[in-house]
Amino acid sequence: MLRVFVIFSLFIAAINASGEFTVLNRPKAISFKGNDALESHYVGDVLYASMGNAVSGDTNWNGLTINDPFNLAKGVILVHVQGIGHVTTAGNVKTYELTGSGTDASLNALAAELEAANEPVCDINFEQFDDGVQAWKSCFGDFEAPAAKPTKHLNPSLHTADKQFLQEVGFINSAADHLAEMAKPSNVLMLRVSVDGVAKAHGEKSVAVEEANKLLSAAISRLLAASQKSSDSVLFVQTTEKDVAASRAKRDTIAASTTNPYNLAVYYGSDYPVIFNIILWFMVVFGLSLLAICYAIAAMDPGRDSIIYRMTSTRIKKDN
């Protein structure tokens, strides 16, 4: 029975696991221990807490340990890869399973919270490629970022997805080259790339995806080396999320309206404010009147000549 339960638990974990949370570099002030899986919508909280900030959440994940609260991470670099569950890493790293598909939403919340607190942050998301390029240039400057060289199975002339992926890898390489001289110095740098297009064009288990994995691994290692050279108190994290379709499902659940395609406000006629004011002030006057009547009844003194006292006095005399 125990064996069946263990197998069933592993099966459920395999279904829910959609990626990995890998710590490639950390300052001595913090450490990552244990092997518990991390829910993807808490990724932003983990990064936020690693910089010494208080987080409000109900997670029971205990992988993060703060050894020295006075020398925490001065900077955080995260590379998030969509469309693949694992990116090859080298060296002594700590990896946790990611469950769910809320990494993007968690990173969006982290970026918004940092911006609200006037903390410098560079959030470069290539899901919308043109917006990602503009964000990269605003952070690193108007440099030319040459695309990665094509491989045997990644051909930019045949597949648009291959071309965009090679350009994204090129931006990671250029980020490593200009990390020490950023146009917008930031404490948090987030780079989000995608292998989803390559996987759809060639297949999830194709050689092209393996080559994309190697290119990403080399580019991330290059950025890691640049971060270690610039500072020894940088937390460098790599996250992956394979189930991209599930993360986008919420956006597609509500179909576009055919009667109101521009999402305009509901139109009200010219009689609406008149009727609204009549009802509003009637209810106000009615409420005040009712309050006054209740107060008057409560404070009323009937007096000795009232029927209440006369009936009471007569009954007392009769009883005697």
Curated annotation (Swiss-Prot):
Annotated GO CC locations: apical part of cell; apical plasma membrane; axon; cell surface; endoplasmic reticulum membrane; external side of plasma membrane; extracellular region; Golgi membrane
InterPro entries in UniProt: Renin_r_C, Renin_rcpt
Disruption phenotype: RNAi-mediated knockdown is lethal. RNAi-mediated knockdown in the wings results in increased apoptosis, endoplasmic reticulum stress and lipid accumulation. This is accompanied by severe growth defects including venation defects, defective wing-hair polarity (as a result of defective fz and stan trafficking) and wg signaling. RNAi-mediated knockdown in the notum causes severe planar polarity defects affecting orientation morphology and number of sensory bristles or microchaetae.
Annotated consequence of substituting residue 98 to S: Reduces protein stability and increases N-glycosylation levels of proteins which targets the misfolded protein to degradation. Impairs autophagy and mTOR signaling
Effect of residue 251 to A: Prevents cleavage
Modification note: Proteolytically cleaved by a furin-like convertase in the trans-Golgi network to generate N- and C-terminal fragments. Cleavage is reduced in the fat body.
Keyword terms: Cell membrane, Cleavage on pair of basic residues, Endoplasmic reticulum, Golgi apparatus, Membrane, Receptor, Secreted, Signal, Transmembrane, Transmembrane helix
Site (Cleavage): 248-249, 251-252
Segments on the Cytoplasmic face: 299-320
GO terms classed as biological process: axonal transport; compound eye development; endosomal transport; establishment of body hair or bristle planar orientation; establishment of imaginal disc-derived wing hair orientation; establishment of planar polarity; imaginal disc-derived wing hair organization; long-term memory
Signal peptide: 1-17
Function: Multifunctional protein which functions as a transmembrane receptor in the planar cell polarity (PCP) and is involved in the assembly of the proton-transporting vacuolar (V)-ATPase protein pump. As transmembrane receptor mediates fz/PCP signaling through interaction with fz and stabilizes asymmetric PCP domains through its interaction with stan. Also mediates Wnt/beta-cat signaling through interaction with fz/fz2.
Protein name: ATPase H(+)-transporting accessory protein 2
Source organism (scientific name): Drosophila melanogaster
